[in-house]
């Protein structure tokens, strides 16, 4: 007699344990694993109950399951940005999360048949207690409720609201949503592509759910059936077509065209060739000195512009300029002009170029190289402490400078011709050299200039490739190798 009274009060189970009374409450305060275990163990120990009591137990379990899903959904909504996925892209994920929540709230992902929706299950549960419930709904509930356990990852990673949390995991649209969210390329798709993907997936699942209707619809509307097949076939290709075309990452046509033009391999190779040719054409020579760079640019921009324009096509076609082979006559004349004047004006350079049948650029480069060599010799003399007037004398004893053999022989011939035939400042230069040699090398001799006898021979011997030999007396002979630069 106590069981009907307990059933009228809404309590379930017997008076044996207080934990069974807690199971009758719709929303328990501490919802934990221990409470679930405590609720399930006495239910298994109780004897089989009538169908009405079983319906009430199922309603209570359904309410508990809905409350548990609501708690999981609220905790999942708190993690809108996924901290362990890509922390530097949280803004883009937040935008995708807002779009997906709008789509889910609008009902795009919900199924058309209200089989798993809680709002559709509650009226059925309220209408069932009057007649004895048939067994198929119980089997449907048993099929729906237990598979909630293998889907904790979906509820954790999918941002959905508690209204959509009641969807059963066995629903096809729910599984499709989980698959879409777990795929990597869903973040690179636009909203339009997602809607197309959703529509195609919904049509495919409807065809799978109703194969008879799909067979009836296949022969009659070929165009209407081709559109979902076309969209479904193109849906895997959507990421490749839609990457970079999202509204958040649009780029202007000019910038995209510039990037595509500059980064294409053909144009990249062309730019590299241009830069290399420009580097070779801008540099006049490989051994040009740095202090002559500004002057060479100024001179090249002056009257040398015509020759540079004339040789522009040939210099662009060739990667490197070949060395000019000067004749002996040209070298003699160039050496003579260099001894007379270290720097040339534009008019002098043009005159020398026309007389020697050379271009002004060749004359300019030869003078630059010659000045660089002259400065190296001067620096070597000053480091030895032997140069008094290095600009005019250029004296040295032994300075190992790599000089071409032909140029050295031509220079020695030029010195011989200059001493024997030419007139001008060179005899005075020879007198200066002899006087400076006598005064500058007194520390190497055993006596002073006064100690040399008045009748002592002071001879000037000219060697072929050696230079000038000076003998100071018979007792203190000293031979010096000199080359006039």
From Swiss-Prot:
Which GO-annotated molecular functions does the record name? Answer: DNA-binding transcription factor activity; DNA-binding transcription factor activity, RNA polymerase II-specific; RNA polymerase II transcription regulatory region sequence-specific DNA binding
Question: Knockout: what is the outcome?
Answer: Embryos display segmentally repeated ganglionic branches that stall and fail to penetrate the CNS and the segment-specific cerebral branch and associated cerebral anastomosis fail to form.
Question: What is this protein's tissue specificity according to the annotation?
Answer: Expressed in the neuroectodermal and mesectodermal cells at the ventral midline of stage 8 embryos, Subsequently, expression domains in the CNS widen and have their most anterior border in the posterior deutocerebrum. Oc/otd and unpg are mutual repressors at the interface of their brain-specific expression domains. Expression fades during germ band retraction and is then restricted to subset of cells by stage 14. Expressed in the founder cells of the cerebral branch within the first tracheal metamere.
Tell me the compartments it is located in. Nucleus
Q: Where is the composition biased (Polar residues)?
A: 223-234, 254-267
User: Cellular component GO terms, alphabetically?
Assistant: nucleus
Question: Which regions are flagged for Low complexity bias?
Answer: 114-128, 308-317
Cysteine-cysteine disulfides: none
Q: Where is the composition biased (Acidic residues)?
A: 54-64, 284-293
Which terms are listed as keywords in the entry? DNA-binding, Homeobox, Nucleus, Transcription, Transcription regulation
Note the coiled coil stretches, chain numbering: none
Q: Where is this region: Disordered?
A: 1-65, 114-157, 212-325
Which Gene3D superfamilies does the annotation name?
Homeodomain-like
Which part of the chain engages DNA, per the record?
319-378
Q: What exactly does this protein do?
A: Plays a regulatory role in neural branching of the tracheae: segment-specific aspects of these neural branching patterns appear to be generated by homeotic regulation of expression. May have a role with oc/otd in the postembryonic development of the brain.
Q: What PANTHER family does the database record attribute to this sequence?
A: HOMEOBOX PROTEIN GBX, HOMEOBOX PROTEIN UNPLUGGED
Protein name as catalogued: Homeobox protein unplugged
Q: Which organism is it from?
A: Drosophila melanogaster (Fruit fly)
